[in-house]
Amino acid sequence: MRVEVGQIVNTHGIKGEIKVKSNSDFTDVRFQPGQVLTVVHNNNDLEYTVKSHRVHKGLHMLTFEGINNINDIEHLKGSSIYQERDHEDIVLEENEFYYSDIIGCTVFDDQETPIGRVINIFETGANDVWVIKGSKEYLIPYIADVVKEVDVENKKIIITPMEGLLD
């Protein structure tokens, strides 16, 4: 299964480095040198092997094998990046999920009232924050006091909102 792991937002410098906004988990594995990524540009799948990876100002800075010039990569700005989800070396702990499994889930409160769908996930250091789009946009911390049940198979999440969380 192929999952979207990011988007090329810009280039950096003149040697073919790109800035990638990640919408994925496990970026330390996904973007490590030697990993193969698929860039979808104009409905064409272009495969690239990661040559280098670093994080700068919240963005992932990547170079690809065989790309040494800004002119070779600049046309890919705005393109989405995908990777096959076949990392047997990533072991999920209890209550740990792939972002791609959470994004798109419908969120309900503990009374089964629908709140919205998960549209994005942010890493904050202490815990992830899920962006829920419903009648408004809500930021829900992924903590045990709030998130009570995650049913990935049925794309359903139950939360107990803290006071003021849905205001």
Curated annotation (Swiss-Prot):
Keyword Lipid metabolism recorded: no
InterPro entries according to UniProt: PRC_barrel-like_sf (IPR011033), PRC_RimM (IPR056792), RimM (IPR011961), RimM_N (IPR002676), RimM_N_sf (IPR036976), Transl_B-barrel_sf (IPR009000)
Keywords, comma-separated and alphabetical: Chaperone, Cytoplasm, Ribosome biogenesis, rRNA processing
Database matches in Pfam families: PRC_RimM, RimM
This protein's GO CC annotations: cytoplasm; ribosome
Domain remark text: The PRC barrel domain binds ribosomal protein uS19.
Function: An accessory protein needed during the final step in the assembly of 30S ribosomal subunit, possibly for assembly of the head region. Essential for efficient processing of 16S rRNA. May be needed both before and after RbfA during the maturation of 16S rRNA. It has affinity for free ribosomal 30S subunits but not for 70S ribosomes.
Oligomer and partners: Binds ribosomal protein uS19.
Protein's UniProt name: Ribosome maturation factor RimM
Gene behind this protein: rimM
